[in-house]
């Protein structure tokens, strides 16, 4: 695959301007997301009067299962459609859908309506994958690591502000107001993309190219791609396993009174760690082979995630969450960049859709796994399990790296000529 998978001509879009616009849109989207999502376990208690901790743990798992199943199916579909109809269109679809459906969650009269709305919302929303695809498509090859790292800071910093803002809104006004704020911020993000983001996607030209180039499945799903998807699956389980239970962990350590406020602070610390990780990883990935960064990141992520389970007070939890996020937030950009090294640019939306769906499939697994772990060993057991899964990713790296060395895509210039030959 590698020798034939050359890069297309350099995009005519101003990549720096596009990076700024897409970064800002994703920052706003994550502010909106952070305003409401961390507080779902507390919403179940406050609005729907589900008081039992174990029962709430099961309901939280069902809620996230509905979201993950929907998103797992949708991400691959939207990724393929992005390669056919354009990346900007997919980002707009996700942003406007989120603006419509997230406020409806606060109006759900019971848990099953809540889960149903979340299922529909997840199918049509999800801005991270289309934002990554649009940005990669309009950025020079040698800047891919930089832009993916910078874009990840939008997620972290947006979540950080969103968690703080959401915690304050919930504390002073209530859950309904937080969810409606989320919808309004997503709408602002959608309008920003609508009027300022650029995509030089040509539907007619792409259609002609697709008619000329018919890919067999084994040419697309190469050994290196499949091994990378295994790593995405493991990461999806490890990363998503802990996300729904932060509020429960804070409540376990601190008590219910003030739990919403401290959940916002702990989540903000997580976002601060992710923000710094994005800057560091983006800089390093354009200077070092991304596969060389993965091992130390996995070791640090496992160590600090396990330390979270041992926290005895909120202060220790804030510190360990910051350090864990700093390590773990670097994993996905590294894996995405590894994927761009061995894949065809004209099918990148499809590949990113696959990775997103597989990552989300990890979320489906942890929806079952998380509820069972909480039921059997309490919320602290969830964080120890996540650390173990990160450790298990280490032996999977070896066959992945060996396969990548055989399939590495040699960068090409705007004429399609091999840069090594040009030099």
Spans of features found by a protein language model:
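Juxtamembrane intracellular "pre-TM" segments in multi-pass secondary transporters
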Residues: 2-16, 199-228, 416-423
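Hydrophobic core of transmembrane alpha-helices in multi-pass small-molecule transporters
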Residues: 27, 101, 112-126, 316-330
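Short amphipathic helix-loop junctions that connect adjacent transmembrane helices
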Residues: 39-57, 245-261
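Residue-level signature of mid-helix packing/kink "hotspots" within the transmembrane helices
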Residues: 67-76, 126, 159-160, 271-279, ...
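Conserved MFS/SLC helix-loop-helix module at the cytosolic interface between two early adjacent transmembrane helices
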Residues: 72-105, 109, 285-291
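Structural signature of the two symmetry-related core transmembrane helices
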Residues: 89-104, 183, 292-307, 387
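Cytoplasmic helix-loop-helix junction between adjacent transmembrane helices
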Residues: 117-156, 338
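A membrane-interface helix-boundary motif in multi-pass transporters
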Residues: 171-184, 372-390
């Amino acid at each position: 695959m590698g020798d034939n998978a050359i890069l297309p001509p350099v995009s005519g879009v101003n990549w720096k301007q596009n990076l700024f616009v897409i970064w800002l849109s994703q920052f706003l989207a994550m502010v909106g997301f952070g305003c409401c999502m961390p507080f779902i376990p507390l919403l179940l208690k406050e609005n729907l009067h589900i008081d039992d901790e174990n029962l709430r743990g099961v309901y939280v798992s069902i809620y996230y299962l509905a979201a993950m199943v929907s998103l797992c199916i949708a991400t691959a579909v939207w990724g393929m459609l992005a390669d056919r109809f354009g990346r900007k269109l997919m980002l707009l679809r996700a942003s406007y859908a989120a603006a419509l459906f997230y406020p409806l969650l606060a109006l759900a009269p019971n848990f099953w309506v809540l889960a149903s709305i979340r299922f529909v919302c997840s199918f049509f929303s999800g801005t991270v994958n289309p934002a990554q695809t649009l940005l990669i498509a309009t950025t020079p090859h040698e800047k891919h690591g930089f832009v993916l790292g910078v874009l990840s800071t939008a997620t972290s910093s947006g979540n950080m502000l969103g968690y703080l803002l959401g915690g304050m809104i919930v504390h002073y006004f209530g859950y309904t107001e937080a969810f409606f704020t989320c919808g309004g911020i997503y709408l602002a993000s959608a309008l920003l993309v609508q009027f300022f983001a650029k995509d030089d996607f040509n539907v007619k030209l792409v259609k002609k190219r697709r008619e000329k180039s018919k890919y067999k499945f084994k040419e697309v799903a190469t050994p290196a791609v499949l091994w990378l998807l295994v790593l995405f699956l493991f990461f999806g389980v490890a990363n998503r396993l802990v996300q729904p239970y932060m509020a429960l962990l804070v409540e376990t350590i601190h008590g219910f009174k003030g739990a919403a406020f401290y959940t916002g602070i702990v989540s903000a610390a997580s976002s601060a760690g992710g923000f710094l990780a994005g800057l560091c990883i983006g800089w390093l990935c354009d200077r070092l082979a991304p596969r060389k960064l993965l091992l130390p990141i996995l070791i640090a992520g496992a160590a600090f995630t396990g330390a979270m389970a041992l926290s005895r007070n909120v202060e220790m939890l804030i510190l360990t969450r910051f350090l864990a996020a700093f390590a773990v937030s670097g994993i996905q950009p590294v894996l995405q960049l590894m994927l761009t090294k061995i894949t065809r640019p004209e099918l990148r939306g499809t590949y990113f859709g696959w990775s997103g769906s597989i990552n989300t499939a990890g979320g489906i697994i942890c929806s079952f796994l998380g509820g069972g772990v909480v039921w059997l060993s309490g919320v602290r057991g969830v964080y120890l399990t996540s650390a173990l899964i990160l450790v298990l990713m280490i032996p999977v790296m070896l066959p992945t790296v060996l396969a990548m060395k055989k399939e590495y895509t040699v960068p090409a210039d705007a004429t399609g000529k091999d840069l090594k030959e040009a030099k």
